[in-house]
Amino acid sequence: MSSPDFESLSLSAPVLKAVKQLGYEQPSPVQAQSIPILLDGKNLLGTAQTGTGKTAAFALPFLSKIDEKQRSPQILVLTPTRELAIQVAEAFQSYAKYMKGFNVLPIYGGADIGGQLRSLKRGVQVVVGTPGRMLDHLRRRSLDLSQIEGLILD
C-alpha cells in the first residue's frame, strides 16, 4: 500500500499550494496519520521524534479549517519556550502564505506586550505562545478565547 500524497488529504487549496511551494512531496508518517483525524475534528495525542514534521501535522489541518474573515483567535498553540513559539508561528505563517487576511501572533515574555496588544486588537486567527504570557493576556482580558476551535500543546 502506498502512502498518501498531500492532495489526497483534503487540505484547503491555499494550504496545499503553500505545501507544494515549500517543496513538500509526501507527508511524513505522523502527518499522514494526524491530518485526517484533525480535519475530522477529533482529539489527537501525537508523539514523534524531532524533525518528523509534527508542526505541519497539526498546523496544516487546522489552517485548512480556519475562517480567514473572523478576526478573533481560532487556534491556540501553547509552547514551553519563546524560541519554540517563534518557530511554530513562523511555520504557521509559511503554511498560510496564500490565505488572504491570515494573521498569526507569537506571544511570550520578554517581548513588548504593547505590540502584542495592538496585534490582538487588529485581529489574529492563530495565537502561539508560552503559558506565562498567555495568562498575562487572559488576566488583562486582551486575549479572547471564545472562538477557539483547536488547542495544541506543543
Please describe what each predicted stretch is.
Residues M1-T47:
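Conserved pre-motif I regulatory segment
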Residues P14-K17, Q21, R71-R139, Q147-G150:
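Conserved nucleic-acid-binding Ia/Ib motif block in the N-terminal RecA-like helicase ATPase lobe
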Residues P27-P29, P36-I37, P61, T79-R82, ...:
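Proline-centered helix-kink/hinge sites
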Residues Q33-L44, T55-Q70, I86, E90-A96, ...:
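Walker A/P-loop NTP-binding motif
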Residues A48-T52:
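The conserved Walker
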Residues F62, S142-L143:
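ASCE P-loop NTPase motor core, strongest for the SF2 helicase catalytic module
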Residues L153:
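Conserved P-loop NTPase nucleotide-binding/switch module
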